[in-house]
Amino acid sequence: MTAGADNQALPRDAARAIAGAFAPARPWGNRWDYCYTLAKLRSDPLYPGVLDALRGSNAPVLDMGCGLGLLAHALRHDGQSMPYRGVDNDAAKIARAGKVAARAGLAASSFEVMDLGTQLPVHRGSVAILDVLQYLNAEAQQALLRNAAAMLEGDGRLVMRMALADSSRRGRISRIGDRAANLIGWMQFRPRHYPDAESLRALLQQCGLQVSLRPLYGNTPFNNWLLVAHRS
């Protein structure tokens, strides 16, 4: 990983190139997904951070809670060609993700509907869990993380971005934002539990992983952090 590489959102040209895959096929088509992905890429340092964390590994990536599959497009734009598999409980998003990926000709990429609260895929390689953890209760979070740790193989990495539990202004804004995402229908569930940094670190270290954790909120108002873990 390159220190400091994840402090800013993607440059304008890169963001437009990636978001372009989500533009409607016809001028009068629905531009919601295009506008959302472009705004996300231009404002959020998530993808530079995740791309940097995965760079240098050829391990297949499982993206748990993949949404529209934006990570797959960002990986390919970055020149990372490892197999990608995205799972999410939102069938509508998965349908759109698969359609856009096929239209864009994304190689070695697949998508499927899966509720991570009740089912886990079989996988060996790297695991990405991005802005998902808070939608599971504490017990389900612990089970998911133990299973994700067991999936790491070779030079595979566990890469997570999540809002952490604290009493900061950023923490309060994160909770409000997550509730709003549920109210407008973008997220199917309300947040259930925000983890704290030390509990996450302790659990993953018990699983035999080396853990790094640092802020990843850039210029956004949210209390987002990036966790990267790998086998010792």
Question: What do the PLM-derived regions correspond to, one by one?
Answer:
Residues 2-59, 68-120, 139-140, 159-232:
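Class I (Rossmann-like) S-adenosyl-L-methionine-dependent methyltransferase catalytic domain
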Residues 64:
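Conserved beta-strand/loop positions that form the S-adenosyl-L-methionine
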Residues 125:
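Conserved acidic residues
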Residues 128:
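A conserved beta-strand element that flanks and buttresses the S-adenosyl-L-methionine
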Residues 131-132:
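Short catalytic micro-motifs in class I SAM-dependent methyltransferases
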Residues 142-154:
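A short glycine-rich, Lys/Arg-flanked "PGG" loop and its adjoining helix->strand segment in the class I
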